[in-house]
Amino acid sequence: MGLNGNGAHARAGRRKVEKVVIRFAGDSGDGMQLTGDRFTSEAALLGNDLATQPNYPAEIRAPQGTLPGVSSFQIQIADYDILTAGDRPDVLVAMNPAALKANLSDLPRGAMVIANSDEFTRRNLAKVGYASNPLETGELSDYIVHSVPMTTLTLGAVESIGATKKDGERAKNMFALGLLSWMYGRPVTTSEAFVREKFARKPEIAEANVLALRAGWNYGETTEAFATTYEVAPAKLEPGEYRQISGNTALAYGLVAAGQLAGTQVVLGSYPITPASDILHELSKYKNFNVLTFQAEDEIAGIGAALGASYGGALGVTSTSGPGVSLKSEFIGLAVMTELPLIVVDVQRGGPSTGLPTKTEQADLLQAMFGRNGESPVAVLAARSPSDCFEVAVEAARIALTYRTPVLLLSDGAIANGSEPWRIPDMGAWADIDPDFTAAGADFAPYARDPQTLARQFAVPGTSGLEHRIGGLEKANGSGDISYHGANHDLMVRLRQAKIDGIAIPDLEVDDPGGDAELLMLGWGSSFGPIGEACRRARRRGVKVAHAQLRYLNPLPANLAEVLRRYPQVVLPEMNLGQLALLLRGKYLVDVQPVTKVAGMAFRADEMEEIIDAALDGTLADRERDKASFARSAAATMGAGQTVSAGQGR
């Protein structure tokens, strides 16, 4: 079989599989994210459906060989439509003992472990608490274990070009990529081209990585250790042109598209923050699409610039994560008072404070809804997947420009860094967005309103004859003059709320194939994939379960009350302590059952399946109470220096 993935293996047997879940794991400096990304690109070229889940520490260079320093990248590829990156890995590539120990509990019996045996030294084993080498003791007997001296083989491969030992060792991730590419029939020619382009200014580094990549492929082809290769056929996707895309990239593309649909400049004022920084980086490439990016000195300056751009007639955008939203809250309030369009992208992460910068969470919902002084309503939307970020960004722009309001667009770390195939849309079929600027010579009052949308009139500064001032003090309805009159303030508060309540949004769609489910699984944001996959599995077992996913969180869909009352049980899993459940219970007086998780990782589909079963057998409420009681009892019984081990408190 050639390096382009064509042909048949002369020695290894070929086995067809519908799907596979692979996890690459090693030190944060071992290149696991790049390795996973390249394997993802190879799978995309073959037409597989795929989903990815990166997981890495917050430190730029975490302590080598330690459990906190482990970086991993999980990908599921399949020959059918999938919704998640998979529950548990079928294959674990462990570059050192820490990677093995950190991920071993996630492996199902019979999974394959491919370990870089060169790194299983006495010192590295001791760092993570191994008294002996698990590759040799038999304690991995539940798994198919391949000990591969990746470092030694890589150094041997690059010896011919005189590469240094340091450069050779850095290329061992390419050896792992080559081996896995051989095993699953992935073409590596595109990865070779990528490496040569990436290191074009350092051809010796490029050559070392290419040689390592080929060495991994050739090792699989020639060794007797791997008796089987695997084939995952292309998925039957809707006709169209596809590309692999991450959530942050899709969101950036959506903002560019929105600017084109509205005929306005997009101005991003932003301060780099994990996990939202890629939006700033990506948008900076599109000056030719009338996009201006401004990397500010802090979060407050970023949103100030964005709001100023909106006042000047552009579409102002700022991107951040939870800590940044806290800092931006006063300017968001100013945008509410001045009734200017503004998009605030919040890529949520673990909190509070600095929290868990590289881990995912959904705990900013109440902050997005209410995190400002006074009655300060804003529209709130949530993306449900990486590719969905494109549509949600365009929709956020439509609402912001049409209704003259700030829009909080919620993503999270799992969506932002995850990737999946995205069918490139035909933008000619999308409706234009009308900013509806007041033209010179028209009747104008800054706070005169459209009777349908309640949006105020807006004249771009400098428009002849329409000079005006706005600011943070309360305005008189119509004229926009400063007003301290109580009755006017009451009117303006209610008008601003009515404007948000009246935003035109579609009804909530419910996936209930038989129309007779007893249980509704309700979600928002990145829970879409795990809930959807769990419902598919449950239905195959004969369980009647419905699924609905909220995109619009403020305002909520008009039919939501009817949907909630239609089902005897409504369960709402969230990566917080029940924030949306709290809102829905209060607004609709429906017994929405919250299911909470704040472990820094997204729900898995198998967890959701357990939640469905627990809801139907009546044990779900007890499970949730157990989580709270475990936290209190753990605090009372754990001594100094102790920590919660993996799996406790779930």
Language model region names:
Residues 237, 245-254, 262, 392, ...:
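Flexible, low-complexity linker and terminal segments
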